[in-house]
Amino acid sequence: MANAASGMAVHDDCKLKFMELKAKRTFRTIVYKIEDKQVIVEKLGEPEQSYDDFAASLPADDCRYCIYDFDFVTAENCQKSKIFFIAWSPDTAKVRDKMIYASSKDRFKRELDGIQVELQATDPTEMGLDVFKSRTN
């Protein structure tokens, strides 16, 4: 199904991998990219993948959509997790790509039922672990 604003389709695998992450916690991260006018799964991060490895894997000059299953401990010492959606749009990305990702984001997010927190990041500091922790309340 294409988005009228951007003409983007969403590959079925995008939703299937997200549901798998949500239900079975098979992955820690999912990185999506737009290719040939559709959103596709670019790579999956194993449950053991560290946050630093995930952040380092994002391209420095290209946009991506990401899902990150963030584990944390509450003030009451309870283990919890929240599913973050990250719109990665680095300052060095091409303007046209930033526009395509921005115009397709809401439509794509609607396909992924269960996102709990959304972040917009243009550089790694905007999606640091401290930012994740501050958004878990």
Curated annotation (Swiss-Prot):
The keyword ATP-binding does not apply. Keywords: Actin-binding, Cytoplasm, Cytoskeleton, Phosphoprotein, Plant defense. It comes from the Eukaryota. CDD domains: ADF_cofilin_like (cd11286). The modification Phosphoserine is found at S6. It is found in: Cytoplasm, Cytoskeleton. Its main location: cytoplasm. GO terms for molecular function: actin binding. PROSITE patterns: ADF_H (PS51263). The keyword Phosphoprotein applies. Residues 5-137 form the ADF-H domain. One of its GO terms (cellular component) is cytosol. Pfam families: Cofilin_ADF. InterPro entries: ADF-H, ADF-H/Gelsolin-like_dom_sf, ADF/Cofilin. GO terms for biological process: actin filament depolymerization; defense response. Induction: By the root-knot nematode Meloidogyne incognita. PANTHER family: COFILIN-RELATED. Actin-depolymerizing protein. Severs actin filaments (F-actin) and binds to actin monomers. Required for normal cell growth, plant development, cell organ expansion and flowering. Essential for root-knot nematode infection. Interacts with AIP1-1. Plants silencing ADF2 show net stabilization of F-actin that blocks cell maturation and root-knot nematode development and reproduction. Belongs to the actin-binding proteins ADF family. This is Actin-depolymerizing factor 2. It comes from Arabidopsis thaliana (Mouse-ear cress).
